[in-house]
Amino acid sequence: SEETRKSYPYAFCLTLTYTLDADGKLHMNYKVKNTDTQTIHYQIGTHPGFTCPLEDGEKFEDYVLEFEKEENAGFHSYNTEKLEFDMTTYTKALDHSRVLPINYPLFANDALFFTDLVSKKVALKNPATGKGVEVAYPDFETIAFWTAAATEAPFLCVEPWNGSAIRSDEDNDFM
């Protein structure tokens, strides 16, 4: 649209395809086609939110993020005043572990932005019941997790990204 062209001056076609297979798996495919006469620059990511907790009587704190591989990783937090990820801070979250217990205080500084994970699959689940959701993100470089912690919202967003919001180690010049 003309409105989009004011802030993103490239011609492109974005196709999002959601397919539910016979096993009940939801596949989300994103295709960006350059319809311009020049190279286009872009970042893309997803922001799906999942109910957490799933069942009555459960708490948000009953859930964990379980990664497919053992991780030695941490995250950067979002600075809500500067509206950027603070790349000067790093919180070690996984010390040769696959499991990150979650709670609302963990999200007190907004999103958790992981840039150094080996895993390309993560499950949000209650280990006591085994119930939850698994997200595979083989074509994405990074992943973030977010909830509205201040209101103890009953969901967690699992956000695979190629690119991110502005980071403290870069300028705000997109092009």
Question: Where are each of the predicted segments found?
Answer:
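FAD-binding core of FAD-dependent oxidoreductases
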Residues: Y18, I44-F50
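Active-site/ligand-binding surface loops and adjacent short beta/alpha elements
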Residues: T39, G49-Y137
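Short solvent-exposed strand-capping/beta-turn motif centered on an Asx-Ser/Thr pair
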Residues: D23, K33-Q38, P127
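Short, hydrophobic/aromatic beta-strand segments
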Residues: Q38-I44
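Active-site scaffold segments
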Residues: H27-N29, H47-G49, F155-W161
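Active-site pocket scaffolds in enzymes
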Residues: K131-M175
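Extended, loop-rich substrate-binding clefts of extracytoplasmic carbohydrate-active enzymes
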Residues: S1-D23
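Short, well-ordered beta-strand segments enriched in hydrophobic/aromatic residues
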Residues: L16-Y18, L26-N34
